[in-house]
Amino acid sequence: HEDDWTNEDVWVKAAPGLVGITESGKRFGIDKEGHPIPGYMTKIEDMRDKCRVAKQMPSAQNNFLTKRLNIWTQQENRWLDLALWDQNNIRPVTEETCMGRMSYGGIDLSSVSDLTIWVQLFPDNDDPDLIDILIRTWCPEARLYDTKNKYREQYQSWVKQGYMWTTEGDAIDEDVIRAHIIEDSGKFNIQRIGIDRGFQGYTFARKLDEELGGTEKDPMVAAVGMGWVSMMGPCQEIERLLLLRKLNHGGNPILRWMADNVSVKINPTGGGKSPNKATSQGKIDGIIGILLGLDGVLRNAGPVKVTDEYNAIAF
């Protein structure tokens, strides 16, 4: 029989230094007068807060089980809870609802024949913590009918529903993507666009930056690292906004699929996490696009929330 890890009464088995009164009334580490006994250091309030987050965030649950309760687990570090994700479907997001608003972009450019994602994050004018996500997803047309593509029926359905667009041929047409982003710059007040520092599309990024009026000192398109240090702030921010129910994705089914797929690498020293394509159970490009956009949002909020310097496109 395994104990219920959410039951406060059993926490003392793994945390003998627990101090406080459980929800059922059991007392640990306090004397008859209610004073803490010397040597009992783990406050039950802290455990309670971490347990609450663990219930809603799979990656936090794994961390809580292993580090707080000494429960060894083989589960992968799944990151986002789908029920919590669904609770962030707050209002419709369209070009019309975002027209003229300030945005922070993120591009996850495909290698050749995969998906390319262009995400824009729009902080609400009245509530900066409320962010609307506008996403555009492209796929090479040939991939819709490629029998080796196990997602082809999904893609075909999303194209019919207007959630996915295609470019002609077997490979993604970067000129189409760039032209669309330039067109968007006339509709929205784009502040910054983040792009994966490790990607191979230097020419794409350089041309886009030039066309958007970026400079070496003040780039419009900036390379962002995807490691623990660079992703610490964006990963924490996406979790915070989801828990506040303020990361409005408008019910986009592609983003929902990717949110369910994504897993993370957790720094064993406790210094953050980063998305892990290798262990994720499918495509996660849209989530990476959101993280790249959040990097720009955080930098606009001030240096305190930033963990890595922005880099002009200079590979």
PLM ranges: what are they?
Residues 1-22, 154-157, 211-304:
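Metal-dependent DNA phosphodiester-chemistry modules and their immediately adjacent helices/loops
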Residues 184-192, 216-221:
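Short, surface-exposed connector motifs at secondary-structure boundaries
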Residues 76-107, 186-191, 195, 203-211, ...:
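Flexible, glycine/threonine-enriched loop-and-boundary segments that flank and lead into catalytic domains
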Residues 1-104, 113-115, 131-176:
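Non-catalytic, compositionally simple segments
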